[in-house]
């Protein structure tokens, strides 16, 4: 969750639930549950206005602006944008070595947990392989800390892409899909040493697995997940 508080009261909050992880813990087939929700119109994990939060940058063949990932972080905001635009949007996966520690620890949605920059690279490539035209934008960015002691960073992001590749979400459906999530970093000595990323994995599957004849209306769903 991302929360903004004033005078000891939270007045702005964004939450991502790991509903997919919960379904797997219950011993249910995640893909079958997602397909059932999509085809039966069961109230699911979308906010009623979720499409209004779609990424600001549309799918395009044009490459995003190039930012160099600095060796020494002097401007945290520029560092965050450089990491996302260089690695996710420009597909420069070798740049992970400039941003992450070799033994980075990762925890993510649906029980993902691993250690090491190579495993992180494999995860990112697996996502981009499913959505080759994926376009990601940063919606909110918060941090605390300094260059000497390190930083704690929270990033709310959104992405849009077309499911054109084989991979963890099955055979290509050629459907446009919205992704959103919250990522938190711990940074020490100018490198990301820990990452926590929660994203809407059940919602991704719901968007992809609905039968073509389904009358499922995503705009009317009134729960988050």
Located regions from the model:
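C-terminal and inter-domain tail/linker signature
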Residues: 1-225
